[in-house]
Amino acid sequence: MPANDFVSPDSIRAQFSAAMSLMYKQEVPLYGTLLELVSEINQQVMAQQPEVAEALRWTGEIERLDQERHGAIRVGTAEELATIARLFAVMGMQPVGYYDLSSAGVPVHSTAFRAVHEQSLHVSPFRVFTSLLRLELIDNPQLRELAQSILAKRQIFTSRALELIAQCEREGGLDAADAETFVQEALHTFRWHQDATVTAEQYQQLHDQHRLIADVVAFKGPHINHLTPRTLDIDAIQLGMPAKGIPPKAVVEGPPTRRHPILLRQTSFKALQETVAFRDQQGREGSHTARFGEIEQRGAALTPKGRQLYDKLLDATRVALGGAPAEANAERYMALLQANFAEFPDDLAQMREQGLAYFRYFATEKGLAARDQEGRPTTLQGLIDAGHVHFEALVYEDFLPVSAAGIFQSNLGDDAQAEYGSNANREAFEAALGLQVQDELALYAQSERRSLQACAQALNLGSM
């Protein structure tokens, strides 16, 4: 088939993201309510803060805002992870970053599947945080063997989805009809299944080891456990959730409120208790807690220097608090966070000059008008000072460093945490994945460099 008959991976991803949102809205009605609240708040922010809308227009994010979301799944075996990577590749999504969640008391390690080029992200920024269960962290050998045997028996992909993945790999793409079929077949992998694959007793054994182990092992597939829309003001969302009948968690995760947001801020409501049917029970008499609602506000992608400062200030806040943030100490935690982060410049020019964040650069109309004039500035700073080049922070496309990932501990209930210490094993994760994960910092640096090259070309300069 001629390549020009193929649907672009970006388009398939956009279709899949829309279909996933529709499915999740039907499965978790509160998600629909959440989308309404996010839309209301985003419209308010853009009406009341024209500078925010202007920045989004410069970067092109204004067009992607309404469709922006991320999902999260957990798979049980290396084979499942490798195949999910092939499935996401059909949609132009690659593994970016390695996250060791064992240090947060969660027996998984993870990556984010997403598009990696700014043009593709502009079409669809959909991303899926994908975790692999670490069976080696189950300290009971009998329970570990039980989990392995249960996982070995399941098939989380439809045969047609596997056929279409292989066809795409073989032929280099999918046509419109096959792409539509692929989206529907791929959705089956992410659906919620009320029928468990274990008995009530087996479920309890897995659950007693860790709730998340039961969530991964006891069901037919890696149901999407949350789908997260992007807001422009997470504090307004946090305040507005109760009026919509959505109880928010005590603390917004990540950095404090800022004029210029950095990295990622997240809040959520606790997981839903859902009825399930265990193998040895008639009807749906059991229950399981897994899926929750989450909202995020994305800010500037930080450089290694910026990340180091972020981690330092966050650690200082945790030490001063003397424990993990919770409902009882939420007010004190937020006050400490705000005070400590006063050290992090809340000004884009200062962040740029100090090398704390990545930026995108744009040739202005003034710059284009002067592109052939003699004596015009030729250095980047000179061009910025003269108004020939405009800059905006590159949006953070990834996830919170685990040091801030309290979402993972809090949304399943306060007793969901176990002690695993830090057991990072990127090599084992990549072996299971069958691919190397990409370095997110290198991707931001490349994106920044491409924008500088585009500016230089537009302004008739050799380089900047």
From Swiss-Prot:
Annotated binding of 2-oxoadipate, by residue: 70, 74, 226, 402
Residues reported in the UniProt entry to bind Fe(2+): 70, 226, 294
Group of enzyme by EC: oxidoreductase
Keywords: Dioxygenase, Iron, Oxidoreductase
Reaction it catalyzes: 2-oxoadipate + O2 = (R)-2-hydroxyglutarate + CO2
Regulation: Inhibited by EDTA.
EC number: 1.13.11.93
Superkingdom of the organism of origin: Bacteria
Observed phenotype of the null mutant: Deletion mutant is unable to grow on either isomer of lysine.
Keyword GTP-binding attached: no
Cofactor: Fe(2+)
Gene induction: Up-regulated when grown on L-lysine, D-lysine or 2-aminoadipate.
Site, Important for substrate specificity: residue positions: 74
Statement: the UniProt record of this protein carries the keyword Translocase: no
Function field: Catalyzes the decarboxylation and hydroxylation of 2-oxoadipate (2OA) to form D-2-hydroxyglutarate (D-2-HGA). Is specific for 2-oxoadipate. Is involved in a D-lysine catabolic pathway.
PANTHER family to which the protein is assigned, alphabetical: 2-OXOADIPATE DIOXYGENASE_DECARBOXYLASE, PTHR39479
Membership in a protein family: Belongs to the 2-oxoadipate dioxygenase/decarboxylase family.
Protein name as it appears in the record: 2-oxoadipate dioxygenase/decarboxylase
Organism: Pseudomonas putida (strain ATCC 47054 / DSM 6125 / CFBP 8728 / NCIMB 11950 / KT2440)
Lineage of producing organism: Bacteria, Pseudomonadati, Pseudomonadota, Gammaproteobacteria, Pseudomonadales
